[in-house]
Amino acid sequence: NIKTSTGKHAWYYHRLEKLRDTLSASLLKVTDETTAGVLSSMLLGDKSYLDDEIKDLYQVSGISHILAISGLHISIVGMAFYRLLRKRRVSYTAAFICSAALILSYAVMTGNAVSTRRAVGMFILTMLAAALGRCTDMLNSLGIMVIYLLWDNPMVLGYAGFVFSVGAILAIGIVTPLMSEPKGEKFWASVSIQLPMLPVVAMNYYELPLFAVFVNLIVIPALPVVFISGLLASAAGCFGVMPGKLLVFPAFAVLKLYEVLCGLVMKLPGASVITGAPDGYRIFLFYAVMSGFLVAFSLKKRAIECGLKEKGQILYSVQRVVCTAVLLAILLVKPKTAAQLDILDVGQGDGIFYRFESGTCIFIDGGSSDRKQLGENVIMPFLKYNGIQGISYWFVSHADSDHISGLSEVIDSGYTIEHIVVAEAAAKEEAMEELIFKAKEAEIDVCLMSKGNSIEINDASGSRNTANEEADGIMCLYPGAADTASDRNDMCLVLKLTDGAFSGVFGGDISSEVEKELVKEF
């Protein structure tokens, strides 16, 4: 975002800031807030009123890249202005200087993000080559901009926007020529851009949108319509609402199409697969295998060009399919993990995760009284980072907000929870009834547990772990179905977890008096 500036150039930055605010306000006048928020993000780099649900929908569908200022934006604005000047018989040099000045101002106005600076730099190099009567090489231009950006700030190497921006251009320049062909060109071009970026996506979002290739085949060709319509509408809206409403309609219609398309895709099984953050060895293996396939593609293309057409073409097509499948398997297939216990830092509250050696995952509580949006900012990132695709049993000790606030958000997110387990003696409390109602609305099975009840957890083969006398699983130690207490904390679900040689007791907020009684009994 543009910050307050002082000095001899401050007036320039202030004018750009005012222009962005004016165009953003114009969009709010000519269309609804949701559409205006998306257009402001795409055109002006202003995400201040971008709808969170739309942002999340675009992200899990694999099209969140359209919300950033990219090379497409720079090309449309810069090339349109450059061609306009050339039609007016302006010289190559003058057209280049004016176009570069416009693009640099646009970059500053939209926040001058790293990806924008990369795109602007490459555009200026392309225009400079044209002005000098030369052609430009995309990968060399990218190399120059990478050196410049790293020289300016070496820390951008760890910035996701830089990695995504540079990675996408590398994929276009190296992988696309080797994987695409006239038959199915658009599909394989989309695959060749998406495939090399999968580890980067998994490292930053911990999940992969498997249908992004197909979604982008529809989304990207329509982007110029959205961009041009939105830009014209924002300008026209400054002079009159009705012209702006007419001009924004194409953008509005396309964005609604995007929303419907993403909604339909997310209903498909496996639309978004939680992978967790891939470790270094899997990332190395991914790119090593991909490099091997690219060498094979290069040799096969050369053979096809030398006349071995029919047989070579079939083998080439098979190689591309196998390459895609193998690379996906490297990221999606995970080795069996050991038992794992994590006590999350939730502030004033409780949140405990446990994964049995068999792979069954449970969660106990998940709430905080002093951290807002705990589910979105703490619990969900933790689960996705660890590659946890669902929770088999989510135990609720009691219904105080510092134990269930995050769980409530997780339910709203649609994350997979098979069973929610609550104390039978506390099931009639108002707060607990509200939680049970929300769970049932989300089609989550609700189980009532009381003293003596247990849930057995078998290993992957279905057999019981005999390393311990007790069966692996969870046993309820307290309260009984008929127990009562004046203090709600003393009605907490007390659980004993057993997994092979490991066992532990989880008591929620029970008082020391109840603890002493349980020690005597057990």
Report the location of each language-model feature.
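Aromatic-rich juxtamembrane segments at the membrane interface
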Residues: 1-121, 127, 342, 503-507, ...
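Internal transmembrane alpha-helical bundles of multi-pass membrane proteins
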Residues: 112-303, 510, 516-518
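Core dinuclear metal-dependent hydrolase active-site scaffold
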Residues: 150-158, 263-393, 440-522
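Metallo-beta-lactamase
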Residues: 391-402, 425
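Divalent metal-coordination and catalytic microenvironments
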Residues: 42, 70, 111, 161, ...
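Membrane-interface helix/helix-cap signal primarily in integral membrane proteins
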Residues: 1-65, 377, 381-384, 390, ...
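Membrane-interfacial alpha-helical segments at the cytosolic side of multi-pass membrane proteins
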Residues: 71-90, 123-129, 169-177, 229-233, ...
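Short internal beta-strands
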Residues: 418-426
